[in-house]
Amino acid sequence: MNLNYLDFEQPIAELEGKIEELQLVGNSSDVNLADEVAKLREKSTKLTETIYSKLTAWDIVKVARHPQRPYASDYISRVFTEFDELHGDRHFGDDKAIIGGVGRLDGKPVMVIGEEKGRSVHEKVMRNFGMPRPEGYRKALRLMEMAERFKLPVLTLIDTPGAYPGIDSEERGISESIAQNLAVMSRLRTPIVCTVIGEGSSGGALAIGVGDHLNMLQYSTYFVISPEGCANIIWKTVAKAPEAAQAMGVTSKVLQDLGIVDETIPEPLGGAHRNVDEMARKLQERLVEQVEQLSREPIDALLERRYQRLMSYGN
């Protein structure tokens, strides 16, 4: 895979470019450059470690939005088996920005719901760039209520720039659909594990984000408004987005310190897009353990703990 490098990764890109040049020379001649390539690879790894150890909140926002970052569909295909997608909200239509269905996690049946941005131009348009409309959240609600009836744990994968704010979305009740999901998820009689895999923005993320355990991938973000939106409101310019990201505390580390996030799942060096299979394996391991722990708890005790968890926010 040809990596797209972010602005702060340019020194890494230059080193990787030199490695490619040496490999081309070595492949087209009898000169053995393996030692030189190995040295440069080691140097590139150390440089990546140094750069990623000093990321600002704004840098992490960029990583969370990386165009090659794995999406919900990438994790669903790797983490779950026998996945059968279910469609439609039974009211209006089928929103492609929400993927949901029944699958197996370590052989046990679960309900999986994820927000999907789409990779190609065609997919992005079809998925509405990961911005669900009311029918998307109502589809998610239908699947969660189905999971409750069949006693299936619910696993959500959060990755959205926000709920779609268009006129058609407002006409069909986007605020009501989000509010209804929040209310139902808070009392759903089955374990719920939520994971922010990329962008977790505003009510669009919260609509599938209420549960018993909240994970964030190391370089994902979670916020009530985008840093650009915050900067535009406070400073009247998007140029202040880096300062807004820092002030808002959008990273997994800050949110875990505040007690909002339960667990940060480490990513491969350089972000999840550098090694999707490794990231999927780590996510699977954590989800298996978390679902097993929650499933052992009596449902009434689980609901009480979920209620207390929600009531503790802001205290």
Swiss-Prot record:
It is found in: Cytoplasm. One of its GO terms (molecular function) is carboxyl- or carbamoyltransferase activity. The keyword Lipid biosynthesis applies. GO terms for cellular component: acetyl-CoA carboxylase complex. InterPro entries: Acetyl_CoA_COase_a_su (IPR001095), ClpP/crotonase-like_dom_sf (IPR029045), COA_CT_C (IPR011763). Keywords: ATP-binding, Cytoplasm, Fatty acid biosynthesis, Fatty acid metabolism, Lipid biosynthesis, Lipid metabolism, Nucleotide-binding, Transferase. Pathway: Lipid metabolism; malonyl-CoA biosynthesis; malonyl-CoA from acetyl-CoA: step 1/1. Its EC number is 2.1.3.15. The keyword Cytoplasm applies. GO terms for biological process: fatty acid biosynthetic process; malonyl-CoA biosynthetic process. Acetyl-CoA carboxylase is a heterohexamer composed of biotin carboxyl carrier protein (AccB), biotin carboxylase (AccC) and two subunits each of ACCase subunit alpha (AccA) and ACCase subunit beta (AccD). This is Acetyl-coenzyme A carboxylase carboxyl transferase subunit alpha. It comes from Cellvibrio japonicus (strain Ueda107) (Pseudomonas fluorescens subsp. cellulosa).
